[in-house]
């Protein structure tokens, strides 16, 4: 395809992204993350003309984007929390209260190098369900979520 896609931020700054036919929203977000140091999970992208939010996993060209198109980037605000692992070590995580427990678990998986099915999270003594948003648990800036390993055996 060739050509560039323009990503425009609310502050007016713009970045140019080399566009490929097969490029997906996830790949675009990774490119943006490298350029402006905003994690992919904090990014919301919309087609500037239609104002439609771009769909994950769908090639950009199938969403009406081509060389010369402009995408609007909105950065979602985050809070910083701690996750304490089974060894008692706490690590900081940047999260949005709208994201699900499963999304936080994916962040933990990457940092702790453990599979999602090998642990569960709890906050203030309550187990956290994967499908529920973090806001349901009353998380606040600086709070600690606990990582609990699943027991093996029978």
Curated annotation (Swiss-Prot):
Subcellular location: Cytoplasm; Secreted
Record-annotated site: Interacts with activating enzyme: 150
CC per GO annotation: cytoplasm; extracellular region; nucleus
Residue span(s) of domain Ubiquitin-like: 2-78, 79-154
InterPro entries, A to Z: Ubiquilin, Ubiquitin-like_dom, Ubiquitin-like_domsf, Ubiquitin_dom
Keyword terms: Antiviral defense, Cytoplasm, Disulfide bond, Isopeptide bond, Repeat, S-nitrosylation, Secreted, Ubl conjugation pathway
Sites of S-nitrosocysteine modification: 78, 143
GO BP annotations, alphabetical order: defense response to bacterium; defense response to virus; integrin-mediated signaling pathway; ISG15-protein conjugation; modification-dependent protein catabolic process; negative regulation of protein ubiquitination; negative regulation of type I interferon-mediated signaling pathway; negative regulation of viral genome replication
SUPFAM superfamilies referenced in this protein's UniProt entry, alphabetically: Ubiquitin-like
KW Transport (keyword) present: no
Region of interest: Involved in the ligation of specific target proteins: 150-154
Modification after translation (UniProt): S-nitrosylation decreases its dimerization, thereby increasing the availability as well as the solubility of monomeric ISG15 for its conjugation to cellular proteins.
Tissue distribution: Expressed in endometrium and uterine flushings of pregnant cow. Also secreted. Not detected in spleen, liver, corpus luteum or muscle.
Linked residues for Glycyl lysine isopeptide (Gly-Lys) (interchain with K-? in acceptor proteins): 154
Up-regulation conditions: By type I interferons.
Functional note: Ubiquitin-like protein which plays a key role in the innate immune response to viral infection either via its conjugation to a target protein (ISGylation) or via its action as a free or unconjugated protein. ISGylation involves a cascade of enzymatic reactions involving E1, E2, and E3 enzymes which catalyze the conjugation of ISG15 to a lysine residue in the target protein. Exhibits antiviral activity towards both DNA and RNA viruses.
Complexes and interactors: Homodimer; disulfide-linked. Interacts with, and is conjugated to its targets by the UBE1L (E1 enzyme) and UBE2E2 (E2 enzyme). Interacts with NEDD4. Interacts with PARP12; this interaction inhibits PINK1/Parkin-dependent mitophagy.
Domain notes: Both the Ubiquitin-like 1 and Ubiquitin-like 2 domains are required for its efficient conjugation to cellular proteins. The two domains play different roles in the ISGylation pathway: Ubiquitin-like 2 domain is necessary for the first two steps allowing the linking of ISG15 to the E1 and E2 enzymes while Ubiquitin-like 1 domain is essential for the final, E3-mediated transfer of ISG15, from the E2 to the Lys of the target protein.
Listed name of the protein: Ubiquitin-like protein ISG15
Gene label: ISG15
């Amino acid at each position: 395809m060739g050509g560039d896609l323009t990503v425009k931020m609310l502050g007016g700054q713009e970045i140019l992204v080399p566009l490929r036919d097969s490029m997906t929203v996830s790949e675009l977000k990774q490119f943006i993350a490298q350029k402006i140091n905003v994690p992919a999970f904090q990014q919301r992208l919309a087609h500037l003309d239609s104002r439609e939010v771009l769909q994950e996993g769908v090639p950009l060209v199938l969403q009406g984007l081509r060389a010369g198109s402009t995408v609007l980037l909105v950065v979602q605000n985050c809070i910083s929390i701690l996750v304490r692992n089974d060894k008692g070590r706490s690590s900081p995580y940047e999260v949005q209260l709208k994201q699900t427990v499963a999304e936080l678990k994916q962040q933990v998986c990457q940092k702790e190098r453990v599979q999602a099915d090998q642990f569960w999270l709890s906050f203030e003594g309550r187990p956290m369900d994967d499908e529920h948003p973090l806001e349901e648990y009353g998380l606040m800036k600086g709070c600690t979520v606990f990582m609990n390993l699943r027991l093996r055996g029978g």
